[in-house]
Amino acid sequence: MPRTLTDPTADRAAAFATDAAADGLTVSLIGSCVATLTGRSQRDLAAGVRTLLWKPDDTVVVHGASGRDPDAWASGGPVTVDAADGLTVACDGGHTAGALRVRFDAVHTATAFDAAGADATTVSGTEAALKDRVLDTPDLVEPGFQPLATERDTPAGPIDIYGRDADGTVTAVELKNVRAGPAAASQLQRYVAALRRTLHADATVRGILVAPAVTAKTRRLLADRGLTFSPVSPPGSRDR
């Protein structure tokens, strides 16, 4: 079934979108926004209510209230999501003539769905099975890891598993039942930053991405941000 948020904050919408994209879902954002398309020339879209679609191949399409053709689109480049000044979605347009930047003043609805027609219940169940496996055998994450809570709420969204490592350090664990991409690393970083703000400024917080595998780019991002990858697969897989 589709995932949906109504009137989310920028932080909530950013967390929702990056998490859904990391799961290979199509993301739809409806809200009041402005957009800029740059390339051979610059084109600005004035404030208005529009629909943004972020597809699994990192194509971003923006539709207005009327007409068949999109108001703007970009594809081929990495998509970045930021909530520092409202929700901003940007695509550098690696395979197109222009880069697209969309900034939402308000998001009315955020939806994520499997446009390919895969059974979303099966995906969710597989992730739940991976979570159960980690909770049953926490040492799969790393020796000495102790889970304390699941779906712990933060300003960046709920953390899959909240716990402490062998040294007692607060640890956020992000679970992916398939090979994780850069969006998963970005989401994990959001959780870590949110926990640091919630606890205290000098708190030490770790982040561990648990998935069967990660892309090369994701591995680099994790290393650059001081995050950890732990290879764990859902039950029934031939992998660890």
From Swiss-Prot:
Answer whether the UniProt record assigns the keyword Nuclease to this protein: yes
Where does it live in the cell? Cytoplasm
Q: Which Pfam families match?
A: NucS_C, NucS_N
Q: Name one GO molecular function term.
A: single-stranded DNA endodeoxyribonuclease activity
The set of disulfide-linked cysteines is: none
Q: Does the record's keyword annotation contain Mitochondrion?
A: no
- The EC number on file is 3.1.-.-
Q: Alphabetically list the UniProt keywords.
A: Cytoplasm, DNA-binding, Endonuclease, Hydrolase, Nuclease
Family statement: Belongs to the NucS endonuclease family.
Instruction: Explain the purpose of this protein.
Output: Cleaves both 3' and 5' ssDNA extremities of branched DNA structures.
Q: What is this protein called?
A: Endonuclease NucS 1
Provide the organism lineage as a comma list.
Archaea, Methanobacteriati, Methanobacteriota, Stenosarchaea group, Halobacteria
